[in-house]
Amino acid sequence: MNMEKRRIDAISNLGLAHIGDGVFELLCRGYLCEHGFKTVLDLHKKTVAMVNAPAQAEFVDKLLPLLNEEELSYYRRGKNAHVHAVPKGATPAQYAKATGLEALFGALY
């Protein structure tokens, strides 16, 4: 086990998701800027459409077959984290998948 792995393992599941939330949003914002969205309103609307639990859950379904075992373990850590509230507009299953995705991005960051 290298130092980086130990550092990641020391972060809580929801801590990884917290980091990954920021990473995922930054990646989405960069993608939108690179693909021709110019106005602040367009950038904001498209970002909000991408960075929410239902959209992230849909993205996870496409991403899962591409993950290796270590990446899947980070995803599962987040997906199985105990959250006490689910945002309106998302089902508990969607929110769990989104939290798993964010934990994965937090670990890979």
Indicate residue ranges for each PLM-predicted region:
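Double-stranded RNA-binding/processing signature
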Residues: M1-Y109
